[in-house]
Swiss-Prot record:
Low complexity composition-biased segments: 189-198
Biased composition (Basic and acidic residues): 128-140, 153-175
Function: Component of the NuA4 histone acetyltransferase (HAT) complex which is involved in transcriptional activation of select genes principally by acetylation of nucleosomal histones H4 and H2A. This modification may both alter nucleosome - DNA interactions and promote interaction of the modified histones with other proteins which positively regulate transcription.
Positions with biased composition (Gly residues): 1-15
Main location: nucleus
Name of the protein this chain belongs to: MRG/MORF4L-binding protein
C-alpha cells in the first residue's frame, strides 16, 4: 500500500495501554487516501469501541504499522478516528459481550452476625496472646524457683554422701589402729627376753 508522509502538525488524544514511546516525527502522519485504506484494512475484525477497545486498538496499531512500514502510536489512530466518528457515542452504544444485569442486593443478616462473632473471637484471641506475652516472665520465675529447689536438694544429697564417706573413713581408721596395737603387743611379747617362755628355753 502507500507510504505515510510526515507532516508538521500533531494531534492530541489519550494513549492506550501497550503503547511504545516514539519520537515526534513518528507521532505525525499525513492521512492520505492510501494511508486511510491501510487503516481500514487493519480494522477488519477489530472494533475500537466497548470495554475491550484498547485491546482491539493494539491489534489495529500493529497491523497498520506493518502495512505502512513504520511505527505509529495508537494515540494518532485514536485522534484520526475521532475526526471521522463520534467515538464516545459509539462506545456508549456498544453492547457488552457478556451479560451484566444490575439488581439490588442486601447482605443477609446471618453473614453480618457471623462477621461480628468472628471479630469478637479475634479480639479474644488477641487478648489471650497479649496475656501469654506478659505471662512468660512469671513462668520463668517459677522455673528459676524450681531449679533453685533442685539445686538445694542436690546440695543436701552431696553433703549426706560426704558425711557417710567420712564416717566410713573414721571407722576404717579406728579398725586399723586397733589392729596395729594388737600386732605391736604380739611383737613386743615375742621379742622380750625376760618373758617366762624365753627363760624356760634358756634353762633347757
Amino acid at each position: 500500500m502507500g507510504e505515510a508522509e510526515v507532516g508538521g502538525g500533531g494531534a492530541a488524544g489519550d494513549k492506550g495501554p501497550g503503547e511504545a514511546a516514539t519520537s515526534p516525527a513518528e507521532e505525525t502522519v499525513v492521512w492520505s487516501p492510501e494511508v486511510e485504506v491501510c487503516l481500514f484494512h487493519a480494522m477488519l475484525g477489530h472494533k475500537p469501541v466497548g470495554v475491550n477497545r484498547h485491546f482491539h486498538m493494539i491489534c489495529i496499531r500493529d497491523k497498520f504499522s506493518q502495512n505502512i512500514g513504520r511505527q505509529v502510536p495508537s494515540k494518532v489512530i485514536w485522534d484520526h478516528l475521532s475526526t471521522m466518528y463520534d467515538m464516545q457515542a459509539l462506545h456508549e452504544s456498544e453492547i457488552l459481550p457478556f451479560p451484566n444485569p444490575e439488581r439490588n442486593f442486601v447482605l443477609p443478616e446471618e453473614i453480618i452476625q457471623e462477621v461480628r462473632e468472628g471479630k469478637v473471637m479475634i479480639e479474644e484471641e488477641m487478648k489471650e496472646e497479649m496475656k501469654e506475652d506478659v505471662d512468660p516472665h512469671n513462668g520463668a520465675d517459677d522455673v528459676f524457683s524450681s531449679s533453685g529447689s533442685l539445686g538445694k536438694a542436690s546440695e543436701k544429697s552431696s553433703k549426706d554422701k560426704e558425711k557417710n564417706s567420712s564416717d566410713l573413713g573414721c571407722k576404717e581408721g579406728a579398725d586399723k589402729r586397733k589392729r596395729s596395737r594388737v600386732t605391736d603387743k604380739v611383737l613386743t611379747a615375742n621379742s622380750n627376753p625376760s618373758s617366762p617362755s624365753a627363760a624356760k628355753r634358756r634353762r633347757t
